Amino acid sequence: LGTEGKGFYACMEGFNVARVVVAAACLGGAEKCIEIAADYAKQRKAFGRPLSKFQGISFDLADLYTQLDLLKLQLARGAWMIDKYYSEPGSFTQKQINPIIAQCKWLAPQLAVESAKRAIMICGAFGYTKDSPLEMAMRGAMSYVAGAEGAANIMKIIISRDIFGNEFVDK
């Protein structure tokens, strides 16, 4: 199973892979919420115009879309680093990988929640009914914010250690 006394470290390595999966799931959920809201905004009319023509709607989705794109890039970077870590030993250390993955795990669930929330607002009353996939998206995203594979504050500790060093960050 591994070297005696090193089980904790082996377990912690596994968290990075799991956090990539969690972040990817959240980004997929966020993307779907943005798509649903955009489709609805193109079809639904107010004052004779599609909702998408109102900047309050289009700018919200532009913000979410931009954050989604940036997080996809960061997640791809982190996944690539993990792949290299296992396929080319010595290419990266866990110390180099940890903060990248923590950033993704911290921000992706928040983006998924925010995307679901804004999509629900754009879709109005339909958005939070059981007939809408958005209410389920919100519940699913919240489970990742609350703690699956490490709560947001744990991710911030990992990132803080990268900034300040272990000796300057409380555990």
Name the predicted role of every residue range.
Residues 2-6, 10-171:
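Alpha-helical interface subdomain recognition
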